[in-house]
């Protein structure tokens, strides 16, 4: 399946197996033509070191990593280890998406569209414009209530 995906311009494969299947994931990674990214495997800073050699990169989500400071430390460590970086999200308001977007310049990929799934988002913040995350030019992280 990964071979098939690689022939169709897929960028990477995210968490192909349950997080407990560490050896099996490392086996897949050794044979994969695509980078293998950690998601459920990863929550906090110590998990980044555990991901080394098992995954090619990590998907950092603020809601799992406890916030900007921890997420930043995770990104710095992963970069030092030569890993790929992605900032991701779950279904979250524009407040959380805008906070996560502060780290986007450090990342190889950004998947920050969780606010688009909310019909009653109470915040105005980062926006997706032509596939690019644009940060507001306001103080702090730039979020305001609507």
Q: Where in the sequence are the language-model features?
A:
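Active-site-adjacent beta->alpha loops and helix N-cap segments on the catalytic face
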Residues: 17-30, 45-47, 66-77, 96
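P-loop/Walker A phosphate-binding loop and immediately adjacent motor/lid segment at beta-alpha junctions
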Residues: 30, 62-64, 72-90, 131, ...
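Catalytic cores of alpha/beta
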Residues: 1-5, 23, 43-55, 74, ...
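Charge-rich, low-complexity amphipathic helices
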Residues: 27-28, 35, 50-51, 73, ...
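Glycine-enriched alpha-helix->loop->beta-strand junction motifs that scaffold or abut catalytic
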Residues: 4-11, 29-36, 52-59, 77-84, ...
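Catalytic beta/alpha-barrel core
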Residues: 8-21, 34-44, 56-67
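General beta-strand structural signal in soluble alpha/beta enzymes
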Residues: 14-15, 38-39, 87, 110-112, ...
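Flexible C-terminal active-site loop/helix
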Residues: 90-146
């Amino acid at each position: 399946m990964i071979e098939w995906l690689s022939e169709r311009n897929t960028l990477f494969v995210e968490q192909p197996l349950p997080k407990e299947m560490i050896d099996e994931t490392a086996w897949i990674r050794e044979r994969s033509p695509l980078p293998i990214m950690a998601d459920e495997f990863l929550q906090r800073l110590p998990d980044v070191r555990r991901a080394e050699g098992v995954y090619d990169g990590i998907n950092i989500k603020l809601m799992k990593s406890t916030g900007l400071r921890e997420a930043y430390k995770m990104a710095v460590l992963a970069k030092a280890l030569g890993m790929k970086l992605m900032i991701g999200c779950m279904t979250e308001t524009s407040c959380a998406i805008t906070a996560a977007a502060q780290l986007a310049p450090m990342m190889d990929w950004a998947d920050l569209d969780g606010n688009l799934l909310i019909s009653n988002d109470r915040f105005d913040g980062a926006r997706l414009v032509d596939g690019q995350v644009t940060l507001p030019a306001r103080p702090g992280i730039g979020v305001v209530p609507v």
